[in-house]
């Protein structure tokens, strides 16, 4: 998205309020001219679930990520691509492409391993945005997900739950939904590309509300993400 700014210049449309400047202070910038400001209106964070459930799709998924990133770079929309997974109690983020990177080849380094603790992933991307928000005020986070958060590391005991809980099923879905709400409360737009079974579709709705689109095959990822980005662009013009 581009904004057009009116600036003073030595050619263009005469600004009658500035004619005096040419004679008295030898300033010839007495015309209105227009400059395209290529400042983007929003940034995109593409968050790729890299848990072991994606193992059979990892090459195709990486290729789709490259397609999305290249398209956004060509449109001058800053995009960051991050893979996440949970291993031995830690959620690991690997930034495959930063906002500054023009090349997208590192996205091919995507690989799948471990678990997916989605709630912690959303909290983490919020921290990453706090540290490096990019050049725009608005932010769109798009996650590729199966809407089935799962981790071998249990939720620790607490006053409400003295024995703790497995991080799975309703517990993990509610945790992810809570973190999505927290991001949205900060003004961050969160959408999902969902690829999973019918049972998980209900979980996707609990976590993302109506802000998700479903795909049946991994090679549909780029088109689905494109629709979500187009929706964001349309919301900017309202």
Regions found by a protein language model. Give the residues of each.
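Acidic, glycine-rich A-domain
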Residues: 1-238
């Amino acid at each position: 998205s581009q904004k057009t700014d009116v600036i003073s210049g030595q050619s263009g449309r005469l600004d009658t309020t500035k004619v005096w400047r040419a004679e008295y202070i030898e300033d010839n910038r007495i015309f209105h001219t227009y400059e395209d400001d290529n400042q983007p209106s929003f940034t995109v964070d593409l968050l790729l679930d890299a848990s072991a459930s994606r193992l059979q799709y990892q090459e195709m998924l990486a290729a789709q990520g490259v397609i999305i990133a290249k398209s956004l770079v060509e449109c001058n929309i800053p995009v960051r691509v991050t893979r996440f997974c949970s291993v031995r109690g830690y959620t690991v983020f690997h930034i495959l492409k930063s906002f500054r990177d023009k090349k997208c080849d590192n996205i091919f380094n995507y690989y799948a391993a471990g678990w997916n603790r989605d709630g912690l992933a959303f909290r983490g991307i919020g921290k990453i945005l706090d540290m490096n928000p990019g050049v725009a005020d608005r932010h769109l986070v798009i996650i590729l997900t199966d809407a089935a958060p799962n981790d071998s590391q249990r939720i620790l005991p607490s006053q409400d739950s003295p024995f703790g809980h497995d991080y799975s099923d309703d517990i993990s879905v509610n945790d992810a939904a809570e973190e999505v709400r927290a991001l949205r409360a900060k003004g961050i737009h969160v959408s999902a590309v969902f690829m999973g079974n019918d049972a998980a579709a209900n979980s996707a709705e609990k976590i993302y509300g109506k802000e998700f689109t479903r795909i049946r095959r991994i090679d549909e990822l780029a088109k689905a993400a494109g629709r979500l980005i187009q929706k964001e662009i349309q919301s900017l013009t309202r």
